[in-house]
């Protein structure tokens, strides 16, 4: 809570156990299809990065290349985190196409579950792309918005996430431009 108050980050109403809330509600792309995905119950995940994005957003199209590079490199050094895609697309078809076309290496919340997970909506922002970094109990540690309305972009919360998972990352590792909220 101190991190939330200090940085004017949105707060969730109560603590949630993220892995439990996501059980049975995730999918992942496998080349040309979408399949159910299960978090490994034997492996505790300390940090989650929820990536709110949409196929129709040019800002998301710019940022996803950087996020994929980050994910692949970070997974070679740290296994104790997960990125979860939260679609802001208008249909399940658009979400699936986006996941497959971009070859997203991380899981996503099933389209039919997006409105059923209150903490996911509470942790989001008004526009995309948006990053919300949570610990395993639902404390928001970094966010693309300050005070729920001031968009700061994706760079700062991604850098904070890298520190939390003890991964040395610099946006100079990639030539992608900072995403602009849409």
What are the functions of these language-model segments?
Residues 88-127, 132-133:
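Thioredoxin-like thiol-disulfide oxidoreductase module
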Residues 54-58, 88-93, 113-115, 138-140, ...:
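Solvent-exposed loop/turn segments at secondary-structure junctions
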Residues 1-30, 181-182:
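N-terminal targeting signals for export/organelle localization
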Residues 49-50, 131:
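Hydrophobic beta-strand anchors of alpha/beta hydrolase catalytic cores
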Residues 52-69:
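Conserved redox-active cysteine motifs that mediate thiol-disulfide chemistry
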Residues 134-182:
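Thiol-/selenol-based redox modules, centered on thioredoxin-like
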Residues 21-48:
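A short beta-strand-turn-helix
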């Amino acid at each position: 809570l101190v991190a939330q108050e200090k940085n004017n980050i949105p707060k969730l109403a109560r603590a949630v156990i993220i892995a439990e809330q996501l059980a049975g509600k995730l999918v992942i792309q496998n080349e040309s299809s979408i399949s159910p995905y299960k978090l490994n119950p034997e492996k505790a995940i300390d940090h989650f990065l929820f990536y709110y994005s949409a196929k129709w957003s040019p800002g998301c199209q710019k940022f996803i290349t950087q996020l994929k590079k980050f994910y692949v490199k970070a997974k070679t050094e740290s296994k104790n985190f997960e990125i979860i895609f939260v679609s802001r697309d208008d249909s399940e078809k658009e979400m699936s196409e986006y996941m497959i076309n971009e070859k997203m290496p991380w899981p996503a919340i099933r389209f039919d579950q997006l409105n059923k997970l209150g903490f996911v909506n509470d942790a989001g922002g008004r526009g995309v792309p948006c990053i919300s970094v949570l610990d395993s109990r639902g404390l928001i540690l970094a966010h693309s918005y300050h005070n729920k309305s001031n968009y700061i972009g994706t760079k700062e919360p991604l850098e904070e996430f890298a520190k939390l998972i003890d991964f040395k990352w610099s946006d100079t590792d990639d030539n992608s431009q900072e995403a602009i909220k849409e």
